[in-house]
Amino acid sequence: MHGVSVRLPVKVVAGSSRSCIAGWLGDTLRIRVSAPAERGKANAAVEALLAETLGLSTGGVKIVSGTSSPRKLVSVVGLSEAEVRRKLSEVIG
């Protein structure tokens, strides 16, 4: 399913005490990262956390808009929307 791509709206809280997938706020995924919101550190942390959580390489997860905003649009390549939601629900509980 390499050609499959999902766009995922995300709200990020940078500078948190720990990095985690915090849950859903409507259709928007809430993510907390310990990295600060400076020089792309929080964006890189978001991409790495999502890639690890979804079992993808870091190249499979990219922020496509909102790089300087807490609200971002993330592209996930290689998984269907159902697979993304299932894997996220496993860590959110």
Please give the residue ranges for each predicted region:
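Contiguous, often N-terminal, cationic amphipathic patches that form binding interfaces
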Residues: 1-48, 53-58, 62-68, 72-93
